[in-house]
């Protein structure tokens, strides 16, 4: 890709006035080389930080860079694109018949029973705090064994 040249160089104009050695006059805002940093603007003029011309070149360069990136990404996506062939026989695309309702219900009940068995197998009693067993034995002796058994409730049975 060739670098963009300013319009005045393409038109064949001489550009800003120069002295015998090819340097611009000291009060000029032009640069002798493209790679040289811009000269400070004369006092009282309002320019961007890069100067009016540099800012437009910067935006042009940014735009060209973004175009290159977009083109490269587009090519890369095209290279990675897979081809998809559809079969000529449309009957092979017909959906499979649905299973009867009984099969679905049986599958559901099988899954549910296996999950319930797993849950029951993984259950454990919560640990008692330190000294908890002695406290329970003391309460049992004080209140009497019969009264505690009368107040005890049965845990619900799991229907799984």
UniProtKB/Swiss-Prot annotation:
GO biological process terms on file: positive regulation of cytokine production involved in inflammatory response; positive regulation of inflammatory response; positive regulation of leukocyte chemotaxis
Compositional bias (Acidic residues): 7-22
Main location (coarse class): cytoplasm
Pfam families linked: GoLoco
Compositionally biased residues, Pro residues: 35-44
SMART domains found in the cross-reference section: GoLoco
Annotated ranges, domain GoLoco: 62-84, 104-126, 132-155
Protein keywords: Cytoplasm, Phosphoprotein, Repeat
GO terms of molecular function: GTPase regulator activity
Tissue spec. comment: Expressed in heart, placenta, lung and liver.
Residue ranges, annotated region (Disordered): 1-55
Location of Phosphothreonine modifications: 62
InterPro entries: GoLoco_motif, GPSM3, TPR-like_helical_dom_sf
GO cellular component terms listed in the entry, alphabetical order: cytoplasm; plasma membrane
Record has Phosphoprotein as a keyword: yes
Residue numbers carrying Phosphoserine: 35, 39, 56, 59
Biological role: Interacts with subunit of G(i) alpha proteins and regulates the activation of G(i) alpha proteins.
Written domain comment of the UniProt record: The GoLoco 1 and/or GoLoco 3 domains exhibit GDI activity towards GDP-bound G(i) alpha protein, but not the GoLoco 2 domain.
Protein name, as recorded: G-protein-signaling modulator 3
Gene from which this protein is expressed: GPSM3
């Amino acid at each position: 890709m060739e670098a963009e040249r300013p319009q005045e160089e393409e038109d064949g104009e001489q550009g800003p006035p120069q002295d015998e050695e090819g340097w611009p006059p000291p009060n000029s805002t032009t640069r002798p080389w493209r790679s040289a940093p811009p000269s400070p603007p004369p006092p009282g003029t309002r320019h961007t930080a890069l100067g009016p011309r540099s800012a437009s070149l910067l935006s042009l360069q940014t735009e060209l860079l973004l175009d290159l990136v977009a083109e490269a990404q587009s090519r890369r996506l095209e290279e990675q694109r897979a081809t998809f062939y559809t079969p000529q026989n449309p009957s092979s695309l017909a959906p499979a018949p649905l299973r009867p309702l009984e099969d679905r219900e049986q599958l559901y009940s099988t899954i549910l029973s296996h999950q319930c068995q797993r849950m029951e197998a993984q259950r454990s009693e919560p640990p008692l705090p330190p000294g908890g067993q002695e406290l329970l034995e003391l309460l049992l002796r004080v209140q009497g064994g019969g009264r505690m058994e009368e107040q005890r409730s049965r845990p619900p049975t799991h229907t799984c």
